[in-house]
Amino acid sequence: MLKRMRDDIKMVFEQDPAARSTLEVITTYAGLHAVWSHLIAHKLYKNRRYVAARMISQLSRFFTGIEIHPGAKIGKRLFIDHGMGVVIGETCTIGDNVTIYQGVTLGGTGKEKGKRHPDIGDNVLIAAGSKILGNIKIESNVNIGANSVVLQSVPSYTTVVGIPGHIVKQEGRRIGKTFDHRNLPDPLYEQIKHLERQLEKAKNGEIQDDYII
């Protein structure tokens, strides 16, 4: 357990340039608190102490804004940055060295029983606001762009953006932008910029107002 906690703290320093000290990370990083609370809740869940497990997970949700079902299986060095609004479903599995930003949902698509949440591989980055839904698999070394909605399985070494999510980079063949979270395309932003360009053309008389969109 202590080794796991040390690894989690190390992951924070590797991923967040704002982290300045171990004391700061331990006392103020809500994502870390949510992950450590989940370790306790998950152990209780595996021992069929479901009510106690849910009580811990709900208490963690109250203090951190991050909801992780105690049944979810989480690998080593999970970094939840900012974290508010993150939801991780009961049958979800997450590999090692995964980074999740605020507003991410790893959820289901209906009221089906059994396996209904996604599996996330190793070394995956899931940017802010993304939704990965259903019994699908996100393989290792994948990047999910901000506000994407992913409904199908994704192969390794790819970058996915958009609604619905589609591959813009695979196996080193760059179609979209770079690996860095800050440079991943934002579909909503791009749509707004497109509308602004169309409005500017309309003002200049290049197109009729009826055909702006």
UniProtKB/Swiss-Prot annotation:
Protein name: Serine acetyltransferase
Location of this chain's protein in the cell: Cytoplasm
Primary location group: cytoplasm
EC annotation from Swiss-Prot or TrEMBL: 2.3.1.30
Organism: Staphylococcus epidermidis (strain ATCC 35984 / DSM 28319 / BCRC 17069 / CCUG 31568 / BM 3577 / RP62A)
Catalytic activity: L-serine + acetyl-CoA = O-acetyl-L-serine + CoA
Family recorded in the similarity comment: Belongs to the transferase hexapeptide repeat family.
Example of a GO MF term: serine O-acetyltransferase activity
Entry keywords, A to Z: Acyltransferase, Amino-acid biosynthesis, Cysteine biosynthesis, Cytoplasm, Repeat, Transferase
Recorded metabolic or biological pathway in which this protein acts: Amino-acid biosynthesis; L-cysteine biosynthesis; L-cysteine from L-serine: step 1/2
NCBIfam families named in the record: cysE, EPS_EpsC
GO BP field: cysteine biosynthetic process from serine
InterPro entries: Hexapep, Hexapep_transf_CS, LbH_SAT, Ser_AcTrfase_N_sf, Ser_O-AcTrfase, Serine_acetyltransferase, Trimer_LpxA-like_sf
SUPFAM superfamilies: Trimeric LpxA-like enzymes
GO cellular component, one term: cytoplasm
Pfam short name (any one): Hexapep_2
Enzyme class of the recorded protein, top EC level: transferase
